[in-house]
């Protein structure tokens, strides 16, 4: 019995320590922890919302913006970063405030650096992959409470970070959620087990100026850190279209069109696919009942060109769900023939 109690005490002590001592930022074998699978950028609206664009999604009941003021702490050296900021009783009253999205160097935290070739640390650190400097490796730490709609109860809730440089560690309500690198890619996390709809929820994350992934991000550009793109929460039905990838093409000597549609479903339920033109007229329909590929044919569609960028809207819905996923598509064919790149022949 004493051994059991001792083991329990050790485990209780180890849990918070484990949440503060991550090494992913210098581990080349790990570029994500608990990150949701990458997917196409399609947003699920509710029936009747009629959204089709990034701007429209902000008016959807499935969307909750994370833009705005966040409590913010910035340190010059990674060794000086706070390690217990994710605790619910942490006192952040002495912290600054920063806008999200927001680049540190454009808000007075560090200096923007332009590098054509090589790495921004080259004057004070000898490259030794996967290790990156601790000194001058700035770290920004964010905290904010977010009221999650009570109407999201029973939904699956995700966080979307459009671009965070160079990485992100994420906590919700005092619990570690996950990690992501790949700073110019979107990172999404399933927050369903951590959030409480109808209540204020504490979201915390920490960002390093450099991580091991920075060795692969040494292109000719300004080196800037922080949150560079839109961030938000979004709600989804449990039974849903998790991903839809649409590839348009032209056939029959560039006359007719075909859509190759790749669906990822969380449940094998019928899916209805409807293609409408710019005036809202239905021009083709299709269906699917499981994850995988399907096709839709369109007779003599309007072609997409740079001069006439005509777009159709493909709408996908699943039986038993009031989610509507619109995808803009244009029919074109790009080919390399001889020494020329041809569009639509």
Regions from the language model: what does each represent?
Residues 1-22:
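Bacterial Sec-dependent N-terminal signal peptides
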Residues 23-34, 52, 56, 71-75, ...:
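Accessory beta-strand-rich segments of carbohydrate-active enzymes
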Residues 170-172, 256-288, 294:
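Beta-strand-rich binding/interaction modules
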Residues 152-155, 195-200, 297-311:
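Short glycine/proline/serine/threonine-rich loop/turn segments at secondary-structure transition edges
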Residues 202-205, 308-319:
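Short, aromatic- and glycine-rich surface loops/edge beta-strands on solvent-exposed regions
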Residues 245, 315-344:
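N-terminal carbohydrate-binding accessory modules
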Residues 171-177, 278, 319, 344-345:
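Short strand-turn-strand beta-turns centered on an Asx-Gly dipeptide
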Residues 238-267:
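Surface beta-strand/loop "capping" patches
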């Amino acid at each position: 019995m004493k051994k059991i109690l001792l083991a329990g005490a050790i485990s209780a002590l180890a849990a918070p320590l484990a949440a503060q001592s991550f090494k992913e930022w210098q581990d080349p074998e790990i570029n994500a922890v608990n990150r949701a699978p990458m997917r196409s950028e399609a947003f699920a609206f509710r029936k009747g919302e009629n959204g089709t664009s990034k701007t429209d999604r902000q008016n959807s009941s499935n969307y909750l913006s994370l833009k705005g003021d966040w409590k913010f702490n910035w340190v010059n050296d990674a060794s000086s970063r706070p390690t217990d900021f994710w605790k619910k009783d942490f006192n952040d009253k002495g912290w600054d405030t920063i806008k999200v999205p927001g680049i540190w160097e454009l808000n007075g935290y560090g200096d923007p650096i332009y590098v054509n070739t090589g790495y921004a640390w080259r004057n004070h650190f000898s490259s030794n992959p996967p290790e990156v400097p601790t000194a001058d490796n700035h770290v920004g730490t964010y905290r904010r409470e977010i009221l999650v709609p009570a109407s999201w109860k029973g939904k699956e809730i995700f966080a979307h970070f459009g671009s965070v440089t160079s990485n992100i560690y994420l906590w919700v309500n005092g619990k570690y959620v996950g990690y992501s690198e790949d700073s110019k890619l979107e990172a999404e996390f399933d927050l369903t087990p951590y959030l409480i709809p109808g209540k204020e929820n504490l979201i915390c994350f920490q960002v390093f100026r450099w991580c091991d992934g920075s060795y692969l991000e040494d292109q000719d550009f300004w080196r800037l850190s922080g949150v560079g793109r839109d961030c938000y929460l979004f709600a989804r039905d449990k039974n849903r279209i998790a991903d839809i990838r649409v590839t348009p093409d032209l056939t029959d000597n560039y006359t007719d069109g075909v859509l190759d549609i790749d669906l990822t479903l969380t449940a094998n339920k019928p899916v209805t696919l409807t293609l409408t033109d710019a005036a809202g007229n239905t021009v083709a329909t299709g269906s699917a009942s499981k994850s995988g590929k399907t096709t839709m044919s369109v007779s003599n569609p309007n072609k997409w060109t740079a001069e006439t960028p005509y777009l159709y809207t493909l709408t996908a819905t699943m039986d038993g769900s009031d989610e509507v996923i619109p995808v803009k598509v244009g029919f074109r064919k790009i080919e390399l023939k001889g020494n020329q790149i041809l569009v639509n022949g």
